Amino acid sequence: MKDLKSLIVDVPDFPKPGIVFKDLTPVIQDAEAFNLAIDLMAEVARRYSPERVAAIESRGFIFGAALARELRTGFSLIRKKGKLPRQTLTVLAPNEYAVEHFEAHLDSIQPGEKVVLVDDLIATGSSAVSAIELVKKLGGRPVAFMALVELSFLDGVKKIAEAYSEVPVFALVKF
């Protein structure tokens, strides 16, 4: 079995000085590793009987779409403001780089639908908190949040738990 953590590459000073970027593309490029990641996410997600996967732009789409396919669920996009063509609901989405907004189409999640949220990486937890808020405002029931990587030194999982203690959080790799 592939060691997912060993494939992730540190890129210093990207996207700006002082940041050490975790490059996940080697996991995506390696068929065995990528399939392992999706299989492990699916194993966890199945515990919650999701009816939909919603993923955060943009690298979250890679894992979210593959997970939705594996789970045979619908897939919803959570995008930055102004990227979706139809009527949307918007929430504030501050992150470690800037203050942004997340949007989803109003019809992307049905009332009461059980939703697993996916992103590539959990850093400060701000994106996850905003995405969960958006799903709830759309009428969905967030049942889990998952990512390939957690940067545990940034306490993102703690921030998510403080905001939404009812939503379990999972990451396959922790730094």
Listing of model-derived features with the role each one plays in the protein:
Residues 1-175:
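PRPP-associated nucleotide enzymes
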